[in-house]
Amino acid sequence: MTALKNASPFAKALAVAGVFALSAGVLAGCAPAAEETTAGGTTPGGCELGPEQDGDLVLKLGSALPLTGNLAFLGPPEEAGAYLAVDDINAAGKGITIEFTPGDSGDTDNKAYDTEIPRLLNAGVEAILGAASSGTSLQFIDRVIAECVIQFSPANTSAALTTYEDRGLYFRTAPSDVLQGEVLGNLIAEDGHQRISMIVLNDSYGTGLAQFVTDSFTAAGGEVIAAPTYNTGDTNFTAQIAEALAGDPDAIVLITFDEVKTIIPELISQFPGENLYFVDGNLTNYSEVFEPGALAGAKGTYPGVNEKNIADFVKRMNDNWVARGNAALEVLAYGPETYDAVVLLALAALEARSTEGANMSMKLQEVSGGIAGGTKCFTFAECADIINGGGQADYDGPSGPITFNELGDPTDGNILIQQFDENNVPVTIRG
């Protein structure tokens, strides 16, 4: 994990096109031809490339996923996806095994990452999964990339990370909020609302997504009359609720994390729950949190794949999670994306013949299909056989097509639209 201290970071440029109403794709143009990685050189971000490794590879992988904090409900499905991928890869016998060290990202209030990231780096990991929260990822990304370690998030959606100077070491399997904001803004307008308010988490995820919703909704002829913000760790939201309600909105968008559990009771005592809109940071099962019917009819969006289309994978992920002594998964959000992140890292290591972060980073775009000429494959074992046979793999997994561009962003994405039923459980209605 050698780092060149005075190296120039990647210069990034935001390039987004082709947003559509339910499923959103960003096409980065013609894919470039594959290039050979020369051992002994450096990456464009200034990390030293190690030599190819002989024999079977062992990848040391860590995670900084939300086991605590305001996104803790995403911790179980993400860890479940990671463990299943590790087990599948280790059982495949394709020339690589993974040593997995899980960790807690926490949030920007409890700052669990301040102890976990040093622990993982000291353990010698070459890649870290996480965080789920974009704002949390931004708190430790510099520490990770300074060591030429890959940071790979299954759930970060902030557009700020597209242009972040990450030395070419940051990747994600969730699409940018440019896509979710477009879909959500169009959905609200399609539902007939003309004047909306928002309550917004004051971080890169919250304010960024709020802006993209605003852009989409106003382009459709709507008006955003208020968008009060709050900070992570706040516990009283009376002022934000009052500001959101003051202009008599038709609908209210809640761009929050777990704080929504505190916001909802006070808000729906003054505003119909059916006219609320949720986002990926808070779209989850509230059957044991609120009275039946409290959220019936409310809608929300999140990047993901329809569970009905990956039923076998969902069952395997849940069964594997339960077999490890955990309770059955209540939500599945970002589990498939985490699984695919682990598989892509393993495939990149095989292609690079190295488990060093710098070397893997140079092959992740290729194994995702972002470099022209690959053979499509859908499991780790299938793709590994292609690579081990001298071919070029193009992996698509349970989260769907990935296809990294040169910035480490996926160029395809699907946005689900869900609606709460009478039990306050979100059910997919489109996407």
Where are the regions a protein language model picked out?
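Extracytosolic ligand-binding ectodomains
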Residues: 2-23, 27-431
